[in-house]
Amino acid sequence: GGILKFNPKNPRWEERDRFIISKGHGAISLYPILADLGFFDKSELGEVCKESSFLGGIPDTMIPGFETINGALGHGLGVACGSAVALKNKNSAAKVFVLMGDGELFEGAVWEAIMFAGHHQLNNLILIIDNNKISMLDYCRNIIDLTPIEEKLHVFKWKVKTIDGHNIEEVYDSLNSLKEDKSDHPRVLIANTIKGKGVPKLENDVLCHIKSLKEDEIIKAIEELK
C-alpha cells in the first residue's frame, strides 16, 4: 500500500516500520491481511483460536507480523514510545504506528506516554485513535467524557489531524502525509468511526462490542456490507 515498510519473508527486518495494535481485541481482523501479504499460509485462517493454532484472540509476538503481546488495554502507546526512542538512538528512518481505541484514553498510563512522546519530540511516532465513542459496556461519555480530545493532545505537543475513519482514501492520504511530515512533533490521527457501521443490527450499539452473532445473523450482516 506504500505506507508501512515491511518484509513478509523477514518479519524482524531491522528497518521495518513497526505497527502496534494496542486495541488487541482487533488482532483477529489483521490475520487475513497478514496471510494475504505472505506472513503465513492462508490455511491457518481456518484454525483461529483452536488449541493447535498459533493464531489466538489477541496479538502475540509468535505470530509473524505482530510486534507485541497484548493483554490489558492501554499499554501499546507506552511500548511504542520505547520503540520510537530506540529507533531514534539508532538513527533509523523507521516509523512506529500505533492503533488505539478511544476507550484506552481512560488509562493514566496512556497520558503518561502522550506527555513523554511530546516532551521527547518523538516525530517517528504516529498514533491512530479509533474514535467510535463506545467502550466495552457503555458510551465513553457516560464513563469518562474524553472531549475535546484534539485540544488535549495539542497541549501535549502533538500534531493532530481528525478525519472520517470510514473514508479509506482520506485515511490513506492522511497517514501518508503524517509519515512524511518533517516537524518535531509526534503525530496523531483521530479517526471518527461508528461501531458496527453498515450492519443495522450492530451500528452504534454498545453491546456489539461483545455480542456474538448467530449464523443466520452473520450471513445477513455480510449481505448488508456488500
Please report, for each region that a protein language model flagged, where it lies by residue.
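Glycine/aspartate-rich loop-and-adjacent alpha/beta segment that forms the canonical ThDP
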Residues: 168, 172-226
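Hydrophobic alpha-helical scaffolding
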Residues: 20-23, 139, 143, 161-164, ...
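Short, glycine-/Ser/Thr-/acidic-enriched flexible segments
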Residues: 26-27, 37, 132, 168, ...
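Cofactor-binding active-site loop characterized by glycine-rich and histidine/acidic residues
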Residues: 1-119
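Thiamine diphosphate
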Residues: 65, 69-180
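Generic beta-sheet signal
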Residues: 17-19, 94-98, 125, 183-193
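Short acidic, glycine/serine/threonine-rich loops at helix termini
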Residues: 31-33, 60, 109-111, 137-141, ...
